[in-house]
Curated annotation (Swiss-Prot):
Family named by the database record: Belongs to the OGFOD2 family.
InterPro entries: Oxoglu/Fe-dep_dioxygenase_dom, Pro_4_hyd_alph
GO-annotated molecular function: dioxygenase activity; iron ion binding; L-ascorbic acid binding; oxidoreductase activity, acting on paired donors, with incorporation or reduction of molecular oxygen
Required cofactor names: Fe(2+); L-ascorbate
Residues holding 2-oxoglutarate: R296
Protein name: 2-oxoglutarate and iron-dependent oxygenase domain-containing protein 2
Listed EC numbers: 1.14.11.-
Residues annotated as domain Fe2OG dioxygenase: 211-305
Cofactor binding, note field: Binds 1 Fe(2+) ion per subunit.
UniProt KW keywords: Dioxygenase, Iron, Metal-binding, Oxidoreductase, Vitamin C
Keyword Ligase on entry: no
Record flagged with keyword Glycoprotein: no
Length: 349
């Protein structure tokens, strides 16, 4: 007998908080126009939003983004159906993880992390630590796989099938769950290969109990997104893998964890190397400098641990108010419905 799929949840803050105003490089919270004017009119003015028309445009942008988020699950399911019915993959083999796709150094690190004597000190011999910020570089994919994956994504990009934004800040890229990559590619990558590493590197951030993930690819090009402002991820642990192609500049930069005051943060710049991944805590503030030529593609895995986020939402830093959603949700679970606070998305105002 088939079991019903588990319900998916987001935190209610997803519909009000961390709304990015790209023109003025600021994240805002919006519960209504009166609150927004009170909290952000002066901030936006200092960023260059000084006319009534500019402010009205900002409000319109926010309202459109809130509406997009409300419809996200429904529209994502629609896109998945359309893609599964009408898209013909260029390279079907890249949808199913094979060890031949993975770099030898990565496999060695994973093998060590699964051994009975494994510890974090020993694992660090197989990784490159970037300063003392608990940011790690490691080879993940061979270049040939990266090239094929990008060709597959470009093939989909050229199709007239519907496409969703990869996240709330990037405008260009692809949601890998909608294209069918998750079950046989990114899920086994996370469960079989990455979690043994994160269980040693980030035990205090749920690295040993990651139970869901969000997978997407972001694209940077001269006439599209050039850079990415400072932010933190809706994840306990993030893996960012460079897929190529040819480009100049566009390095990542990391400061400190989000609770560190801005005036006390220090920065480290990190170069992209095709096939190599950067592994870091999701709450580590980071961004990307502008590219100056070419195209840059990166695979992003936001890995979630419900044991961690069920206690404290990483985006609002409060106990999550759970909202049932269509689609995949944001990694929250409600094991005991009678003890968890839940609301219906339709009741949010």
């Amino acid at each position: 007998m088939m079991t019903a799929p588990k319900p998916s949840y987001s935190c209610a803050c997803f519909y009000t908080d961390n709304i990015f105003i790209q023109e003025f490089h600021v994240h805002v919270r919006y519960t209504g126009e009166q609150q927004f004017r009170r909290d952000y009119e002066r901030v936006l003015s200092s960023q260059g939003c000084r006319t009534s028309e500019q402010f009205r445009n900002v409000l319109e942008t926010i309202k459109k983004e809130v509406e997009r988020r409300r419809k996200l699950g429904e529209e994502s399911l629609h896109r998945r159906r359309e893609i599964s019915l009408h898209y013909k993959p260029l390279y079907p083999e890249v949808y199913v993880l094979q060890e031949s796709f993975l770099a030898a150094e990565f496999l060695t690190a994973v093998k060590y992390s699964k051994s009975p004597q494994a510890n974090v000190e020993g694992l660090l011999h197989h990784l490159h630590s970037i300063t003392d910020k608990r940011i790690y570089r490691l080879p993940v994919f061979i270049p040939e796989f990266c090239a094929k994956l990008v060709e597959e994504l470009e093939n989909f990009e050229r199709s007239d099938l519907p496409k969703g934004r990869p996240n709330t800040m990037n405008n260009y890229g692809i949601l890998l769950n909608e294209l069918g990559f998750v079950d046989a590619l990114t899920a086994p990558l996370c469960e079989k290969y990455i979690e043994p590493l994160t269980s040693l590197l980030f035990p205090d951030w749920g690295g040993g109990c990651l139970d869901s993930h969000r997978a997407f690819v972001v694209k940077y090009a001269l006439q599209e997104d050039l850079d990415l402002s400072c932010h933190y991820d809706n994840a306990e642990v993030t893996l960012n893998v460079s897929l190529g192609k040819e480009f100049t500049d566009g390095n990542l930069y990391f400061s400190d964890m989000k609770e560190v005051p801005v005036n006390e943060r220090t920065y480290a710049e990190v170069e992209h190397i095709t096939g190599q991944g950067i592994l870091h805590r999701g709450q580590h503030v980071h961004g990307a400098l502008p590219i100056s030529s070419g195209e840059r593609w990166n695979l992003i895995l936001w890995m979630r641990a419900s044991d961690v986020r069920n206690k404290c939402c990483p985006m609002c830093d409060n106990e999550p108010v759970l909202v049932k959603t269509l689609g995949d949700g944001d990694g929250f679970t409600s094991v005991r419905e009678d003890r968890e606070q839940t609301v219906d998305i339709c009741t949010l105002t």
